[in-house]
Amino acid sequence: MKSFFITLFIVFLSMEAYGQHVYKGHVSNANNEPVEFANVYAETGDSSGVHGTVCDINGDFKLQSDKENPVVRISSVGYVSKEVTLTSDTTNMITLSQDVTLLNEVVIKAQRPQYELSSEGMVTNVAGSILEKSSDAYHLLSLVPGIEVKGESLNVLGRGKPIVYINGRLVRNENEIATLQPDAIKKVEVITNPGAKYNANVTSVIKITTRKNSEGFALDSKSTFVVNEKGRPSFMQNILAGYHTGKWDFNGQLYGAYTQWPDDKYLAEVAHLDNKMEVRNNGVQSRSKTRPYGKLSVDYALDDESSLGASVSYDGTLRLKGNGTVYGSVLTDDVTEENLTSDYTSRGHSGIWSGNVYYLGKIGVFGVDFNGDFLWNKNNEDMSTNDMTTLSSGETDKQNVNTSRTDLSRMLAGKLVLDAPVWKGSLSYGLEYSYVRRNSDYTVVPQDVVDGEQSLIKEGMGSMFLDYTRKFGKLSFQAGLRYENVDFKYYDHSVLQKAQSKNYSEWFPSASLSWPIHKVNFQLTYASDIYRPSYYQLRDGVVYDNRYTYESGNPFLDPSISRNLGLSVSWKWLYFSGMFSRVTDEICSMRQLYKDKPNAVLAIYENAGDYNNMRLQLSASPTIGIWHPRVSCMLYKQWDYPVESYGTPASSINKPSVSCSIANIFDFSWLTATVTYSFQSKGNMGNVQIVRAAHDLDLSFYKALLHKSLILQLDVYDLLGTNDSYSRLHTGPMFETYYNEFSTSTVTLSVRYKFNALKNKYKGTGAGQAQKSRM
């Protein structure tokens, strides 16, 4: 199979795009501003072999033709159409004149659809819409159909955590999203069924495109103050600076934050053995973190088609502190046998260095995209726990446990993608390789509580892909094939564990069809993705929580694969999508007794089996005067979930769940206000059963001053304190787990000042994303 791909690679490099010419152009108006989404098509009588296209948001286009110097017509709403003769030796610069129709002094304007289907997914147009007045990038993304935002955590409904690109550059740190300003964003694309171009473990993609840079120096500073319901403050300061001149683009970022948050939880483990045994843990906890972040990047444009650059960043945690008390109890047949008070403190620190170099350009007819990456990540955490157990007889027992964990990960990765016009379409070929070395050390004092851990993981991952796209009239076709090989080696105390070391090889086909019917756009997709266990899930040692609760990984886990068939439909401000998935070797957190102790439960990951699921989503965003409602709802349903659960028939593990978000945006001339209500129903998702519906009410206020140079934002999250999460985990035929997380209401005030609006032009897309996510 590998030789098959290598042969294709040689053929790909050696072949010429027979009879095909590639023409490039840039369309602008009289003010030298790009004309986005202008139509480029052949003039009558000279259309043989010419394929129409559309300009991107920067006014740039590529056109393939088997004729030399074709004559094409350029048109766009609001401009006079223009005929030009294209040349292939340079970028064709085309200027359109405005054509404003006046009827009784009323200007007739065209409004772009809110939602559009791209060749890969659904596009939400932000530029010129009410979304530009969101309080921050996360708030904006929460208003995009299919995206769920909790704090700084993104989730694509029904598809899990996405990877994010900004201007084609892979985002490696959530801080890059947090510091992105909404009015700098042009559009957001959500891909729920990624094809062969993406790593097979990628289940969803968010692609953010921003506006172009201005010449000269630019500055953007934002200060944020947060108070939570406990009265604990947090502070964040972000400074972006850049300088753009000629072919050079320099950018720098400094970010600092001190954050505090409560972390109260309730956990109950129930085991139905000879007797019913129940362990309850009610944790009252708080955490704080001091975090510095810095990044430098430089780009150089070799010409209109080629650029290269480099970047380096540091993301640290100077101090991660946690403390709290866990109140526990053990019940046998509902009678309390003993009570536990567990006081703990934890301290940690971490540092992540990462870097990227890239080249993006052309060699002959071939487009070249190369990225090289490195990553160094070290984490340390120490914890001290004081347990006091009181028996029903009144006797007490005390125990002090100290744990220390150190993880050190290093990664090198490279990625090369070539593309060329082939058979009136476009063919892409990609190669990627990454190597990871991860050391983990975990010690416990006293040593008889749990076994320590000293492990080493070495993992090499190689992948290759082919992707072909072509248009047949109004029908767009894409097909791809990806091959991935993972060589995983696990060492315990420097000794190779052959039973736990594995080699995986998988093929991942993908295909899509897109077509319009009148003003309605349709897209049908097929793709498969894989979930490889994280290094945390593959660890071998046991982690001590308290004398009743322990956690462990499982080095014997197999990857889980999902095969997905999707349909999307869009019309103006309406969008619908549906997806059916077949999942094999689902990975779940299960429960068992720890070392046969009658009152100690071990949480461990296992492969459960196969099942089917479906999700349906409907979104609408009409405009009614100053009111801009945005409604998005999703239905999730699963069948034949493979986990057994005590006292619960299989049908009860397959109940549907519904989530809805209703954002009411009111755009007054002097203020923009948003009232957002979110709802999560009861139901099942995987082995998690939501046992109580959750409600969330958020408020946001946006005010721009000094020609939008000064922006004030006020946000209130979880105003009513009703966004708590109550879950039951189905963890085995003899076990039940109940887990509750409690929401925190916060008030946030932000002050932002910007000068000569700054956007980063860095075009490195990154390599080794699959390994970075698992690290």
Where do the protein language model's features map onto the residues?
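Outer-membrane beta-barrel signature, preferentially recognizing the C-terminal barrel domain
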Residues: L456-E459, A499-K502, I530-T584, V601-R615, ...
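Outer membrane beta-barrel strand-and-loop segments of large Gram-negative receptors
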Residues: M411-K415, M461-S463, D558, Y575-C633, ...
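Face-selective signature of the C-terminal outer-membrane beta-barrel domain
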Residues: Y293-L318, D343-H493, P516-N521, Y575-F576, ...
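Short, acidic, small-residue-rich periplasmic hinge/interaction motif at the N-terminus
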Residues: N39-E43, S75-Y79, T91-I130, V149-G151, ...
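Short, acidic Ser/Thr/Gly-rich low-complexity loop/linker segments typical of extracellular
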Residues: G45-D60
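N-terminal periplasmic accessory domains that precede
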Residues: D89-T95, E105, A137-L140, E174-N175, ...
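Surface-exposed extracellular loop regions of Gram-negative outer-membrane beta-barrel proteins
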Residues: T209-S223, D264, A268, R280, ...
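Short acidic/polar hinge/loop motifs at secondary-structure boundaries
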Residues: L143, R169-G195
